[in-house]
UniProtKB/Swiss-Prot annotation:
It is found in: Cell inner membrane. It comes from Leptospira interrogans serogroup Icterohaemorrhagiae serovar Lai (strain 56601). It is a peripheral membrane protein. One of its GO terms (cellular component) is plasma membrane. This is ATP synthase epsilon chain. The keyword Membrane applies.
Length: 127
């Protein structure tokens, strides 16, 4: 592996979402987004709900992630997410329908969490 690259694995309980060498990442941490470049300091952090951006050259790959952990060590990045989806695996029309139905429900913490996850998947699918 080149010293200018990051070895990245993004894994959910269902499948390996991404595996490869990349130039940089933008990760949705539980306390906010943070960037990862080669030679980043070692770190273990929790993931929030959000968009994970993976950049390799001019190509940008986006995924939705819903919690989990990220570990950075020696240019190797392991992302374990509770649930994740690649842009191409998200059905935009289904997510829009889910959003419309959820917005009709009475306020609750579970509704807010569902809305946040659904809106993230819609953003990923729309990019």
């Amino acid at each position: 592996m080149s010293a200018n690259k990051l070895k990245v694995s993004v894994i959910s309980p269902e499948k390996i979402l991404y595996k490869g060498e990349v130039d940089s990442l933008i990760v949705p941490g539980s306390e906010g987004f943070f960037g990862i470049l080669p030679n980043h300091a070692p770190l273990v952090a929790t993931l929030g709900i959000g968009i994970l951006e993976i950049r390799k050259g001019e190509k940008l790959k986006v995924l939705s992630v819903e919690g989990g952990f990220v570990e950075i060590k020696d240019n190797s990045i392991s992302i374990l997410t509770d649930h994740g989806a690649l842009k191409e695996d998200i059905d935009l029309e289904v997510e829009k329908k889910n959003l419309a139905e959820a917005e009709k429900l009475p306020p609750s913490d579970s509704k807010n969490l569902f809305l946040q996850k659904t809106k993230t998947r819609i953003l990923v699918a729309s990019r």
